[in-house]
Structure formats: structure tokens, C-alpha cells
């Protein structure tokens, strides 16, 4: 899904149209999400006084598994352009228990925001970094030909050409340089300009001029792509970051562990990097990352990311029904209720310490989703229910929905399997009757066994195409027609037998 450059102009109707290209049905959920997303943009246009008073209306999506809750979140993340994080409520534990505390979701969202902002800044600096990377590649290809230090000697570069000498590997047809002749040509000119210059200085200047000429020849070859497969030695630095007490004090246990690991790496010298032999093509990628990382202002990245997270961040909490408690609390239920109470201040608005600074969660939009097949939304603690004022029920899927899911969305299941087999030279022709039959089987199995929604189609498609996928090399250049009879032959007896369908489909 393409990102919209001017997202503030994306109306709720346009957002729904974008989602329609990937998700079948569930119009109520799409409309609720579209309005919530649009309200984020509307709020940013308000005067500062009233802007702080407008709180996001958090959404609770209720629907059976496989009906599109997670897919809506996944597509929304690619569409909104704002810091977006999808988490599962079940991976968090109450404060005091072993596991991740709920505040880590804010730290993770902040990390997502920083990565997005850094990627944008690097893209803006990419053109400027090309010349820097080119010079560093030339320093590695021609050690000693780079910038001169105060003593007149070339600055030391890490790595360099292979031990046999890089010049010996160059094709004579590509470049021919007579260093002695160049030195002779340069020397008389230098003598005319500086008649009193010492002999050693003249020789050094002549050698420097020859080096520069050689460097420019190699620069031209580098730009023409003639050196991409040459091997060079270089020192690759791991981006382990600089540990500091701010990270330890303001982060989580994971941050503390990473900081301590960074300190240990610095003490044992592993932070200095590792020498590797790579091609020029690989070296360019490595150097580009290093140069861009050094050019980016990381303080500005953190500030801009924090602003985006606080003003337009979105967190999608999946499986929230799994932390709901039915009846009286006991055993593990106590911990589940504790997680709910820990989530409360985050959703309502509080300050969370992260390694990038303190983040205010007041205006972060939370979208929660759950099947609620065992528990009900009313089993959540009342305080948490009140933090999700908008409730949207998603519909169960039936055969007509399955038929549309198989064929209508962009990059649908049928399109995916057809494209995969085309790489083997096999053309797949799936008839409408076959699609109808697979849709009926999916509905029947969902009704007789566990209802897993559209995920049942993946299982059925794999079962129908199992033999073709295995024997694809034997059918190269052929067109295989999948009709209703073929589908029945592969699923014969399975859909009617509940025991078989429970374990196979």
C-alpha cells in the first residue's frame, strides 16, 4: 500500500476506499477507524488552547478471529504515516511479575518514531553523502592517496587493498598509468614555478600529483561501475551506541541490558569494529550507512520523534479479551486484572520515561481488539471500559465474503499462488466454480469446527494446491485448470468428516 504524501488531505471516505482495496466488508469498523484517524489531523489544525483539551476517542473492536481486526490495523499502519505500534495484551505482566511491563509499549512506540524520523532525515542527506562515501571508497582502494595530514603524510585509513596490491588486479585495458613519466612531466613545471625548492620537496610534490591523477582515474572507474566486484579490506563498525546513565535510568530492563552490553564491548575492545573482506558494492552499502548515521543529528531525531508520538501516535492492542476476568479473581486472573490496571494510566494519559526522553501519552490514540469468545467486554474492569468509548462490532464471515476475499483484494490469495507458480513456468487457471466450492467448504468447516474466519482459506488453498506445488517442475510450460471437480477431489470426505476436518482443515 502506498503512503499518502499529504495525509492531512485524506478524508474519511478516501481512507475507507484505501482499506476497501485490501479488506472485504467490515464497513462499520473501517468508518470508525477512518473518522478517528481524520480527527487526529483535525486536532492538529486547532488553536493551541483548545488543542490540548481534545482527547482522542479510543476504539474497541469486537469480532471473531479471522474477521479482519488485525488486517485493518496492519493496513492502517501503512496508510497513516504516523508512529504506529501493534502489540498483544497477553505479553505484558503486572508490575512486580516477571515479564514486560505495560510502559514498554510506549518505549517501543518511541523507538518506531525515531526509526521513521531517522529514515526521513537520512533520505534528505543521501545525495550529500554520495561524495563522502566515494572518497572513503577511494581511500580503501588506494591507501595513502587520501587527504594529507599536518606533517604532509597521508591520513591513515582503516582497511585497504588486498595484500597482492590493488593495482595488479586492474585490467590494463581499463587504465594505464606510467607513474615515472607523470613525475618527469610534472617536475619541470614545478622547477619553473619554484626554482629554489628543495629536491625532496619537489619529489614529494611530484608523487602527490601522480597520486591525485591516479585517484581521479579510479574515481572515474568507480562512477562507471567497473570496480564493483573488486575485493577490499575494511573495518566494519557495529552500531552499538554509546551507553550512558540516562538510558539506564530512564529505560526498561532491556535498555539496561543493552547499555551494560555496550559498556562491556567498549572495555574488551569489540566496539572498535571488525576487519572484513568485502566487494566494493558491499563496502558502498556499509559506508553509506555509517556516513548517514554520522551526518544525522540524533538529538533532533529524538525531539521530532517525541513530538510525533505525543501528537499523532497510534497503538493497536490486540487480544485484549485475553486479559479480561470472568467472575471472582483468583490465581492468574489476579495478574490479568493487574495488567488492566497498569494499562489504565497509560491510556488515560501519563508521563513515561524512555531513553529518548519523557513521553506524554495523553493524546496517543489506542485501538483495542479482541474476539471475546469466552469473556465479554463487560468483563474488563469498568475503568478500562470507560477509556474505550467507541465500540465497533465486526461481522462473522460467510461464503459470499470468502468468495470476495479469494478474488477481489489487491494481492489476493489466488493472485499470490498464481504468481508463485508462474516463477516455475506453470500457469494456474482457477475457475469461478472452484472459488465458489472453496468458499462453501470454508463456511462448512468453520461452522462444524472452530470458527477461524478467513484464515481457513489459507488451509484450504494449501490442501487443494499441495500436489501442484510439489510437482511444479514437472508441469513447466503447462496451464493447469482448477475447477470445482478438482477441488472436490482434493477435499473429498474431509469437509463432511468433522474429525478429519478438525485436524486437516
What function would you assign to each model-found segment?
Residues 1-505:
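Non-catalytic accessory segments flanking P-loop/AAA+ NTPase cores
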Amino acid at each position: 500500500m502506498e503512503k499518502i504524501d499529504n495525509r492531512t488531505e485524506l478524508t474519511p471516505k478516501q481512507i475507507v476506499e484505501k482499506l476497501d482495496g485490501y479488506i472485504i466488508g467490515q464497513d462499520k469498523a473501517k468508518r470508525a477507524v477512518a473518522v478517528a484517524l481524520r480527527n487526529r489531523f483535525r486536532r492538529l489544525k486547532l488553536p493551541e488552547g483548545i488543542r490540548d483539551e481534545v482527547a482522542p476517542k479510543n476504539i474497541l473492536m469486537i469480532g471473531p478471529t479471522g474477521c479482519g481486526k488485525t488486517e485493518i490495523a496492519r493496513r492502517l499502519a501503512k496508510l497513516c504515516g504516523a508512529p504506529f505500534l501493534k502489540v498483544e495484551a497477553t505479553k505484558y505482566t503486572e508490575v512486580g511479575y516477571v515479564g514486560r511491563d505495560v510502559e514498554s509499549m510506549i518505549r517501543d512506540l518511541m523507538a518506531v518514531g525515531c526509526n521513521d524520523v531517522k529514515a526521513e532525515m537520512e533520505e534528505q542527506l543521501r545525495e550529500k553523502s554520495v561524495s563522502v562515501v566515494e572518497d572513503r571508497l577511494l581511500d580503501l582502494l588506494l591507501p595513502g592517496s587520501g587527504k594529507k595530514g599536518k606533517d604532509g603524510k597521508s591520513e591513515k585509513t582503516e582497511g585497504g587493498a588486498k595484500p597482492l596490491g590493488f593495482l595488479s588486479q586492474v585490467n590494463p585495458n581499463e587504465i594505464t598509468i606510467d607513474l615515472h613519466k607523470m613525475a618527469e612531466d610534472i617536475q619541470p613545471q614545478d622547477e619553473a614555478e619554484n626554482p629554489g625548492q628543495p629536491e625532496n620537496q619537489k619529489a614529494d610534490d611530484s608523487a602527490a600529483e601522480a597520486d591525485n591523477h591516479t585517484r581521479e582515474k579510479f574515481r572515474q572507474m568507480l562512477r562507471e561501475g567497473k570496480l564493483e566486484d573488486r575485493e577490499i579490506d575494511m573495518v566494519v563498525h557495529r552500531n552499538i551506541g554509546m551507553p550512558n546513565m540516562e538510558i539506564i535510568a530512564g529505560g526498561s530492563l532491556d535498555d539496561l541490558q543493552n547499555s551494560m552490553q555496550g559498556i562491556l564491548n567498549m572495555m574488551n575492545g569489540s566496539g572498535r569494529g571488525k576487519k572484513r573482506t568485502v566487494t566494493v558494492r558491499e563496502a558502498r552499502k556499509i559506508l553509506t550507512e555509517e556516513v548517514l548515521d554520522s551526518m544525522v543529528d540524533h538529538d533532533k531525531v529524538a525531539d521530532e520523534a517525541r513530538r510525533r508520538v505525543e501528537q499523532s501516535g497510534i497503538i493497536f492492542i490486540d487480544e485484549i479479551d485475553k486479559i479480561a476476568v470472568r467472575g471472582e479473581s483468583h490465581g492468574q486472573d489476579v495478574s490479568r486484572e493487574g495488567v488492566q490496571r497498569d494499562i489504565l494510566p497509560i491510556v488515560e494519559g501519563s508521563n513515561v520515561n524512555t531513553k529518548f526522553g519523557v513521553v506524554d501519552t495523553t493524546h496517543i490514540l489506542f485501538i483495542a481488539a479482541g474476539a471475546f469468545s469466552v469473556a465479554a467486554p463487560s468483563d474488563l474492569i469498568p475503568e478500562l471500559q470507560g477509556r474505550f468509548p467507541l465500540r465497533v462490532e465486526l461481522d462473522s464471515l460467510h461464503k459470499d465474503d470468502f468468495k470476495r476475499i479469494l478474488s477481489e483484494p489487491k494481492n489476493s490469495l489466488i493472485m499470490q499462488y498464481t504468481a508463485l507458480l508462474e516463477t516455475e513456468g506453470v500457469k494456474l487457471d482457477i475457475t469461478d466454480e472452484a472459488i465458489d466450492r472453496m468458499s462453501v467448504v470454508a463456511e462448512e468447516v468453520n461452522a462444524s469446527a472452530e470458527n477461524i474466519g478467513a484464515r481457513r482459506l489459507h488451509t484450504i488453498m494449501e490442501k487443494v494446491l499441495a500436489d501442484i506445488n510439489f510437482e511444479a517442475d514437472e508441469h513447466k510450460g503447462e496451464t493447469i485448470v482448477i475447477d470445482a471437480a478438482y477441488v472436490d477431489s482434493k477435499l473429498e470426505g474431509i469437509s463432511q468428516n468433522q474429525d478429519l476436518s478438525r485436524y486437516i482443515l
